[in-house]
Amino acid sequence: MRVFLNLRAGLDRIGACYRVNDYGYAVKNPAVTACIVGKPHVLDRLEWKNPILFGAAVFSHPIDDPELFQRRPIRKVLVPGAWMKEMWKPFWNDSVAVWPVGIDTARWVAAEPARKSTDVLLYDKIMWDRDRLEPILIEPIRQVLRESGRSFREIRYGQYVEEQFRLALSECRSMIFLCEHETQGIAYQQALSCNVPILAWDHGGYWQDPSYFPHKVKFQPVSSVPYWDQRCGRTFAAIDELENAWPAFWDECRSGGFSPRDYILENLTLEKCASAYLHHVRSLSDA
């Protein structure tokens, strides 16, 4: 839903005209590109004749629907990030393109330093095998923060509403982001938009979704921060790197060495990403 809402907001800001779920118009105008942003069930809503731009809120892997291009008149599939494109490319070749949705930089803004009362927001998005990772990853991070005298609070993916996250970001000076991998990573990008630098666990390795790995799909490398540069913060791959990574990261936070919001403004605004989406739409019209 966030992808759909932010795409619409971006299209509104650049003055683009569009229709929402107007299936009757699509049926009457079969030459017009149908942009199906949502999940695959929408593809079965009717017998499409329109050329379809599908994504970026798609299914997890092409093996879920290997005959998709034969079943429906899909011309291009959008995925949120580069590593996902590489995973899909052997199946659908050049029909796969990268498109990330934009971040609302007017809503996710930097708070005044005087509001910052907590050093670290520990963002827990561990999706699988959490019982194993709790004692060997999460608890050691807590211990490092305690030993370094840093105050912290925790937030867990799926257990908050956006406004709670936004409030937490306004009160925290930095964030530690824990996730096996991200296709885009809207939440950490919202933090970057708030000018909150991030120390991210980015261990690479295989795509770990247990519905696919290792019995159906073995793909590597993946990333937990697919949109990133040195302005955003720092990364560590394993817990034994944290002893050096944390103090270096914190020192740079204190000295103002990071500028994460600049990265978002340069790459992932609502307007920039909506314009990129229109480019994909027009590429089908011109084909």
Predicted regions and their residues:
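Conserved catalytic-core segment of nucleotide-activated headgroup transferases in glycan assembly
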Residues: 87-90, 101-162
